[in-house]
Regions:
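Divalent metal-binding segments
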Residues: 15, 19, 50-53, 62-72, ...
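Extracellular/periplasmic ectodomains of large secreted or surface enzymes and adhesion receptors
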Residues: 529-537
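His/Asp/Glu-enriched, well-ordered alpha-helical/loop segment
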Residues: 237, 335-345, 352-375, 379-380, ...
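Acidic (Asp/Glu)-rich catalytic clusters
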Residues: 270-272, 299-308, 391-393
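N-terminal secretory signal peptides
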Residues: 1-11, 20-21, 25-26, 34-35
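Non-cysteine beta-strand/loop elements that form the S-adenosyl-L-methionine
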Residues: 308-319, 396-404
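C-terminal segment of N-terminal export signals and the immediately downstream linker at the start
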Residues: 28-62, 72-75
Length: 537
């Protein structure tokens, strides 16, 4: 079955790093600031046309709710019946296909993945044999100029393949004979591998490659060599490519923990009317002074979120008070965030960390109404019922991540979290320590089986509907978006995905192969494939 270590998240990060609407927003002096002109309706990915989606199976966190949906000006007008629309309204016959709300990742390092070097073949995340990996690379090669690198940095592990081994140099050559290839995995034992053309590049940069296997002996050096040849336009293209990939899986919203430079690329796409995913940036803060500087330079002084419903500043996270998760600076920094009325997400894995952060939350709640601010602790690998109750009583939320799909350690306790009744959502924490693909996470949440097929989270499985709710309306709660997206309710944005398979009835293993054949963000088509290719924007 290969080797999947019982790695901590820190170990996964170390190894992966080695292998790896109020006002609108403008860029000035390296900061996101209020004040640029309002973008047009297309920038918000909405459509001014009327649309009827008929003969579908609309499923959200409540179960199946309708067979027909009517959309006007990007929002849901009716659920279950067709409203009277303009004469030029379009009707799309869904042919009985299952439709879910657009998936929402409650915590992801999204823009960091967008700036990975090369042309990423992220479909490798859902390859379950060497042949499928080769197919993913060969398919990506069709749209990549010859001589340009095809990559996939993080988000996969060799134990997901039926052969339970790394691909060979020869197998990568066969998949992409005209392109250099560099792929590096997440978790133990996978490392980084390249092909013949890639070997020539790395050796020219002084990076050693094992001649027979194609294993890059120093993955950090290999990644640095690739990053050294990146251009700003290449990073922008990579971010747009990632958006297209996400849309193809039905992912339409993310709470993004990224650095300022990377987030500005998403901002640039938004300003050019090319952003196709709802982006909710988080900002770090090491001290109370950092909070005040962020509020002054990056946020609205009024306490209203800067941006529109497509690109909008969310708040602060994931590490408050510095990289030390139990820093003495945590409470005063978090208190300043509460004073200014902003959302907070805090990295909190262990029981010791949970207790530290909960005590600070309790103290701050005596002075400020954090129950109105959507505060949360994230990761929660082994949180118990008592601590969940404390968090719930504070009006805060529990955001669980699925990076243990790549481990034998198990967790988070999804069943316990759902049963507690707390506001809860899920995210991937990808791509260094996990896969971006939401269907792999939904598989893990409902089966308890990891990337290698081992039962590692037994007793904490949840139903498919419960998992869907955590990945839609539940996740959207963490950025104040649950009133706008995440379920099929009149007045909400028409963010949705028409699926390739019926999520509720397919065999467990097939969940990992589900994708979207038609994705809408605010009623606008952002992804379409057969049989809906004619609707492609």
């Amino acid at each position: 079955m290969g080797r999947l270590s019982k790695l901590s998240r820190r170990e996964l990060l170390v190894r992966a790093a080695a292998g790896a609407a109020a006002t609108t927003v403008a860029v000035a002096g390296g900061n996101l600031v209020a004040g640029s002109p309002l973008a047009n309706a297309a920038a918000q990915a909405t459509s001014s046309g009327d649309l009827i989606l008929a003969n579908g199976k609309f499923v959200d966190g409540r179960g199946q709710v309708a067979t027909t949906l009517t959309i006007r000006n990007g929002r849901i007008v009716t659920v279950g019946t067709a409203a009277a629309l303009a004469p030029d309204a379009r009707t799309i016959d869904l042919g009985g296909r299952t439709v879910v709300p657009g998936l929402f990742d409650a915590h992801v390092h999204y823009t960091r993945a967008g700036v990975n070097p090369g042309y990423e073949a992220r479909r490798i995340e859902r390859a379950f044999s060497i042949a499928e990996l080769q197919e993913a690379i060969a398919e990506r090669a069709k749209s990549v100029p010859p001589g340009q690198f095809i990559t996939c940095i993080g988000g996969w592990n060799h134990t997901q393949f039926a052969e339970a081994r790394r691909p060979t140099k020869a197998e990568l050559d066969a998949a992409a004979p005209r392109h250099p290839v560099y792929i590096s995995g997440t978790g133990g034992g996978t490392g980084a591998i390249t092909n013949a053309l890639g070997t020539a590049f790395f050796e020219s940069k002084g990076v050693m490659v094992e001649t027979r296997t194609g294993v890059v002996t120093s993955a950090p050096a290999g990644l640095a060599a690739l990053q050294g040849s990146q251009t700003p336009d290449g990073k922008l293209r990579g971010t747009a490519d990632l958006n297209a990939h996400a849309n193809s899986l039905g992912l339409t919203g993310v709470v993004n923990a990224g650095n300022l430079d990377d987030q500005e690329l998403a901002l640039r796409l938004w300003r050019e009317d090319k952003l196709t995913i709802r982006m909710r940036p988080l900002f770090s803060a090491d001290s109370p002074q950092d909070v005040e500087a962020r509020v002054r330079n990056n946020f609205s002084q009024s306490g209203r979120a800067v941006g529109d419903d497509l690109f909008r500043v969310a708040g602060f996270g994931e590490r408050i008070g510095g990289t030390d998760t139990m820093s003495p600076q945590f409470e005063p920094t978090a208190r300043m965030i509460a004073k200014h009325g902003w959302l907070l997400q805090q990295h909190s894995i262990t029981t010791k960390e949970n207790d530290f952060h909960l005590e600070a939350f309790r103290s701050i709640a005596r002075e400020y109404p954090i129950d109105k601010l959507r505060w949360s602790i994230i990761h929660l690998q082994s949180i118990d019922e008592a601590r969940l109750k404390t968090l719930k009583d504070l009006g805060a939320g529990a955001s669980a991540q699925t990076w243990t799909y790549f481990s034998i350690a198990g967790g988070p306790p999804f069943r316990r979290i759902v049963d507690s009744g707390i506001r809860a959502g899920v995210g991937t924490d990808s791509t260094n320590v996990s896969a971006l693909d939401p269907w792999l996470s939904l598989f893990y949440m409902t089966t308890g089986r990891n990337v290698a097929g081992m039962l590692t989270n037994d007793g904490q499985q949840i139903s498919r509907i419960e998992a869907l709710r955590l990945y839609t309306e539940g996740a959207a709660w963490f950025s104040f978006d649950d009133h706008h997206v995440g379920s099929f309710v009149e007045g909400k944005y028409a963010d949705l995905a028409v699926l390739s398979h019926d999520y509720l009835t397919v065999p467990e293993q097939t969940i990992r192969k589900i994708e979207s054949v038609l994705t809408l963000v605010g009623g606008k088509v952002v992804h379409a494939t057969s049989p809906f290719s004619a609707y492609r924007a």
